[in-house]
Amino acid sequence: MAKSQIWFGFALLALLLVSAVADDVVVLTDDSFEKEVGKDKGALVEFYAPWCGHCKKLAPEYEKLGASFKKAKSVLIAKVDCDEQKSVCTKYGVSGYPTIQWFPKGSLEPQKYEGPRNAEALAEYVNKEGGTNVKLAAVPQNVVVLTPDNFDEIVLDQNKDVLVEFYAPWCGHCKSLAPTYEKVATVFKQEEGVVIANLDADAHKALGEKYGVSGFPTLKFFPKDNKAGHDYDGGRDLDDFVSFINEKSGTSRDSKGQLTSKAGIVESLDALVKELVAASEDEKKAVLSRIEEEASTLKGSTTRYGKLYLKLAKSYIEKGSDYASKETERLGRVLGKSISPVKADELTLKRNILTTFVASS
């Protein structure tokens, strides 16, 4: 197979993966609004602004609603960013945020939702208007809850990098951060060496004082090699947190929790793979020995990657030069299906490393 076809396959797979992990709340734009709304299903639409405090407070409730109704074929749960999509917001008379409107099936004439802004009330409203009987889904919590009983065991574990939010239940900024912080925990839930945690420092004042907490929320990072901890002073968007953890922990996740194309790549072994592919049949065993030697020097999480490089190099020698491209194709097909996150990680690492074999052929 030509290299261009292989790289096209990678790009297509990436698009499939992004679609598979898209938010349960459908994002609408000026261009897509009337292609989705007013058709064969009723639609509940939140018109919001990213800077709006009430919108931030509503966000986790609305996401819970979206998760619950995602399989309901007769109902759409959607949202519009009115900072970006001014035309459609103006058209439907939006003058404050958040504005929630219900569009009946086959109609672009909305009725404004005036009820409580929580998932339970919204679900009751949608079920009534949409003729559905959907129960609210339980939303998994991936943020580790700390207490005085487990704080030292979790935070001071020298095998883990731990990000801790010290918060107070009454703190408005903490409430605004909560949905983003939960997403951060979800992104890194497959990483054994990373923990995203929080502590109610209002209820557990002694721990807050011990770590110099004087305002809420306070975020502190406790890396494996510095359990005194230090303040996190970065941005508070999802991408900011993900970039920080990737840099500090050596992980390679995107904001959807998928491994990036850099995951598993070891530069020194990549260089040896290129030599292996270019080597004559008589020279390949000598290069394989060097790969084995280099892999044995790796430490920490890279030890796993070294073993995978060695295994794939042996398969490349045993099965022939077309092994890498055929195996890459097969992995692409499997990754395009519904598989567990653990399996997806395993196959993505393998595919990433095989990319060097393919590119060097």
Swiss-Prot record:
Secretion signal: which residues? Answer: 1-22
Source organism superkingdom: Eukaryota
Quote the catalytic residue positions: C52 (nucleophile), C55 (nucleophile), C171 (nucleophile), C174 (nucleophile)
Q: Which UniProt keywords apply?
A: Disulfide bond, Endoplasmic reticulum, Isomerase, Redox-active center, Repeat, Signal
Q: What is this protein called?
A: Protein disulfide-isomerase like 2-1
Pfam families, per this entry?
ERp29, Thioredoxin
UniProt domain Thioredoxin: residue ranges: 23-131, 132-250
Where it sits in the cell: the answer is: Endoplasmic reticulum
Q: Where is this site: Lowers pKa of C-terminal Cys of second active site?
A: R236
Q: Which InterPro entries match?
A: ERp29_C, ERp29_C_sf, PDI, PDI_thioredoxin-like_dom, Thioredoxin-like_sf, Thioredoxin_CS, Thioredoxin_domain
Please give the function described in this protein's UniProt entry. Protein disulfide isomerase that may be required for proper pollen development, ovule fertilization and embryo development.
Q: Listed disulfide bonds for this chain?
A: C52-C55, C171-C174
Site positions per UniProt: Lowers pKa of C-terminal Cys of first active site:
R117
Q: What induces it?
A: By chemically-induced ER stress response.
Q: Which family does it belong to?
A: Belongs to the protein disulfide isomerase family.
The main location class comes to: endoplasmic reticulum
Tissue specificity as recorded in UniProt = Widely expressed.
Q: Give the catalytic activity.
A: Catalyzes the rearrangement of -S-S- bonds in proteins
User: SUPFAM superfamilies recorded for this chain?
Assistant: ERP29 C domain-like, Thioredoxin-like
Gene3D superfamilies per UniProt: Endoplasmic reticulum resident protein 29, C-terminal domain, Glutaredoxin
A GO MF term: protein disulfide isomerase activity
| Residues marked Contributes to redox potential value (site) | G53, H54, G172, H173
